[in-house]
UniProtKB/Swiss-Prot annotation:
It is found in: Cytoplasm. GO terms for biological process: ribosomal small subunit assembly; translation. Required for maturation of 30S ribosomal subunits. This is Ribosome maturation factor RimP. PANTHER family: RIBOSOME MATURATION FACTOR RIMP. Keywords: Cytoplasm, Ribosome biogenesis.
Amino acid sequence: MTTGLPSQTQVIELLGGEFARAGYEIEDVVIDAHARPPRITVIADGDDGLDLDAAATLSRSASALLDKLDTIEDHYVLEVSSPGVDRPLRTPKHFRRARGRKVDVVLSDNSTVTGRVGETGDDTVALVVRAGRDWAIREIPLGDVVKAVVQVEFSPPAQAELELAGVGGTDKTEERRK
């Protein structure tokens, strides 16, 4: 077994400032000492997502900082990536970053809601949901959300739906709020 790999906490402390200066936040660090070679995966996200160029830049910075650690005795693979589409939305920040995206939400009463993420406050998220042939905004208390996952879409959403979510046009949120 490879020894000398930093802990998750050490990686976050070492890289957190550098990532923050670049406008990103470390969401998670996964260290797999059993892989050959060992693997350190840093999951990062920002308000505008993490594109390939930003991931490459962060990876170079992270590699330089990690290489300075005296505790790493062996070769390792470093990966910097975004959380991915299947990451559950857990915090208000996650919902804010998913604004305009379609989500499936399981509520504490075991009901499910599918809608497009709109404005997110500290305690609630506005979901744009189907109301017959039209769209409506449903306020969901974040405390009632058991699970929320972004859905992959293969066709573009309706313009009215995007507008209610506050993306892609004029914001008519206040005009149509239930």
